[in-house]
C-alpha cells in the first residue's frame, strides 16, 4: 500500500470504505499487496482487498464502487439542475431511482425536492426534474414521504410541496414510520410551510406512534415539538405557535403565563402577573423543554424568567423583573442535588450568542456570577453532570460561537 503498510490479516477485522471510494486506488492497493509478496497473485491480492472492506469477492467490491461512482455522478447532475443528464442516467439505469442518496438515504427524489444544492427556491428546471422522476419511476412516498418532509423545511419550497402533493404525497405521513411530516417546519420554525401543510389537511395533533406505545410524552404534538425544539428565534417561534393554535393545535405546555412568554404576548403576560403577582417567582415543574446549545439542560422547575432567558425574550424578562421577579431565583434541585441554576445559565449557553441581549439585561439587574450548580452537560454525553458557574457553562458548551457572551461575562467579573 502506498504511503504505508496495510494489514490484510482477517483477524484484524474489516474496515469501512472511504466516503468516496475510488476503483483505481483499490486496484493500486491490490497491486502493491502483490508486489510486497503478501499475496500469491493479483487475483489473490484483489480477493484480500475485497475481504478487507467486507466484500465476499473482488467483483462484488468492484460493482459496489462503480455504483457509488454513478450515484455521485447523478448527484452532480441534480446539483447542476441538468435535467437532460438526469433523464439519460435514470433511463439507462432505472434502479438509480432507488439509489441511497439524499437525507436519510431516502433516494434521489428526496435530494431533488430539498433544493439544498444550489440553496435556492425550486427553479423551473428543478420542478421539471422532480415531476419527470415521479412519472418515470421515483416513489413520491420513499422513506415515508421523505421528499415532502425535506421540502417542508422551508416556505420557499412550497411550489415543490404543491407538486409532490399533486402526485399523491401525504401531508399526514410518518417519515421513517415515526416522524410526522408536520414536525419538519416546526423544527425549522417556518410558519409559511407549516400553514401550507395545515391548509392542505395536515393534522396539528398527530403524534409519533411509538410515543403512545411507550406511554411517554415526547415528542407529543406539533406544538409540543415546536416548543421543545433546539432552534431559537422568538419571532419565528411566536409565528408558528399562532399558526398551530389557530388550527386547533394542542400542547402539554398549555400554561397561560408560559405561552404568553413564548408567543411574545407582553399584554397577556402583564395582565396575568397583575392578577396574580406570585406568578413572577412561581416554579414550573412541567417544563421538560428548553434543550438547545448542544446541552441537556431543561427548564423543569424554572421560573418565567428562566423561560424568557431560554428563548431570548428580553421584553418579557424586563417586565418580569419590574414586577418583582428574582433575577437570582434558582430552579428546583432534585434529590440527587441536580438543578438550582439561575436564569443566566440558560441565556449564556445559547448557540451563536443568541442569548447575549437578555444576558446583558440579567447582569444589569444583578445576576450573581459566582453561583455554582450541578446541572446536565453536553448533549453528546448523555448522563453527564457538570458543576459550574454561568461562565464555566458558557465555556463548556458555547466555545468560540459564544465569544461575545463570554467576553461580556468576563467584563462583569465572572469566574469559572
Question: What name fits each language-model region?
Answer:
Residues 68, 96-97, 103, 115, ...:
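Alpha-solenoid repeat scaffolds
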Residues 81, 125, 155-156, 189, ...:
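Ankyrin-repeat intra-repeat helix-capping/turn positions
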Residues 66-76, 200, 227-275, 356, ...:
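Ankyrin-repeat-protein effector appendages
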Residues 2-88, 92, 111:
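Intrinsically disordered, low-complexity eukaryotic regions enriched in glycine, serine
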Residues 103-104, 121-128, 155, 159, ...:
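Residues within HEAT/ARM-like alpha-solenoid scaffolds
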Residues 90-96, 127-139, 162-170, 195-204, ...:
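Ankyrin repeat domain, specifically the short helix-to-loop turn at the C-terminus of the second helix
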Residues 84, 128, 159, 192, ...:
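Structural detector for tandem alpha-solenoid helical repeats, activating at a conserved register
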Residues 69-76, 98-118, 141-153, 174-187, ...:
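Ankyrin-repeat boundary/"N-cap" motif
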Amino acid at each position: 500500500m502506498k504511503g504505508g503498510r496495510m494489514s490484510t490479516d482477517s483477524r484484524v477485522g474489516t474496515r469501512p470504505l472511504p466516503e468516496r471510494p475510488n476503483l483505481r486506488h483499490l486496484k493500486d492497493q491490490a497491486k502493491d499487496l502483490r508486489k510486497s509478496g503478501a499475496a500469491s497473485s493479483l487475483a489473490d491480492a484483489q480477493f484480500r482487498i475485497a475481504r478487507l472492506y467486507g466484500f465476499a469477492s473482488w467483483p462484488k467490491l468492484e460493482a459496489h464502487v462503480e455504483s457509488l461512482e454513478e450515484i455521485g455522478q447523478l448527484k452532480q447532475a441534480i446539483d447542476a439542475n441538468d435535467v437532460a443528464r438526469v433523464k439519460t442516467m435514470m433511463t439507462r439505469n432505472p434502479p438509480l431511482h432507488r439509489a441511497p442518496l439524499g437525507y436519510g438515504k431516502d433516494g434521489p427524489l428526496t435530494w431533488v425536492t430539498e433544493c439544498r444544492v444550489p440553496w435556492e427556491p425550486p427553479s423551473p428546471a428543478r420542478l421539471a426534474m422532480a415531476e419527470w422522476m415521479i412519472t418515470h419511476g421515483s416513489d413520491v412516498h420513499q422513506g415515508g414521504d421523505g421528499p415532502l418532509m425535506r421540502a417542508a423545511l422551508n416556505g420557499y419550497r412550497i411550489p415543490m410541496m404543491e407538486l409532490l402533493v399533486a402526485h399523491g404525497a401525504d401531508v399526514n405521513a410518518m417519515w421513517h414510520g415515526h416522524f410526522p411530516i408536520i414536525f419538519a417546519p416546526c423544527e425549522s420554525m417556518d410558519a409559511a410551510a407549516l400553514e401550507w401543510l395545515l391548509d392542505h389537511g395536515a393534522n396539528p395533533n398527530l403524534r409519533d406512534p411509538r410515543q403512545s406505545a411507550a406511554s411517554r410524552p415526547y415528542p407529543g404534538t406539533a406544538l409540543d415539538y415546536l416548543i421543545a425544539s433546539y432552534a431559537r428565534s422568538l419571532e419565528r417561534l411566536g409565528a408558528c405557535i399562532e399558526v398551530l393554535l389557530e388550527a386547533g393545535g394542542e400542547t402539554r405546555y398549555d400554561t397561560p403565563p408560559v405561552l404568553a412568554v413564548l408567543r411574545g404576548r407582553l399584554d397577556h403576560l402583564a395582565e396575568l402577573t397583575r392578577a396574580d403577582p406570585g406568578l413572577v417567582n412561581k416554579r414550573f415543574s412541567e417544563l421538560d423543554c428548553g434543550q438547545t446549545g448542544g446541552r441537556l439542560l431543561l427548564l423543569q422547575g424554572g421560573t418565567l424568567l428562566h423561560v424568557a432567558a431560554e428563548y431570548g425574550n428580553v421584553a418579557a424578562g424586563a417586565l418580569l423583573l419590574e414586577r418583582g421577579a428574582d433575577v437570582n431565583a434558582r430552579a428546583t434541585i432534585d434529590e440527587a442535588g441536580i438543578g438550582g441554576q439561575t436564569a443566566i445559565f440558560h441565556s449564556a449557553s445559547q448557540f451563536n450568542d443568541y442569548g447575549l441581549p437578555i444576558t446583558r439585561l440579567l447582569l444589569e439587574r444583578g445576576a450573581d456570577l459566582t453561583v455554582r450548580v450541578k446541572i446536565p452537560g453536553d448533549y453528546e454525553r448523555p448522563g453527564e453532570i457538570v458543576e459550574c458557574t454561568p461562565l464555566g457553562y458558557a465555556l463548556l458548551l458555547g466555545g468560540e460561537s459564544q465569544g461575545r457572551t463570554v467576553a461580556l461575562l468576563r467584563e462583569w467579573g465572572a469566574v469559572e
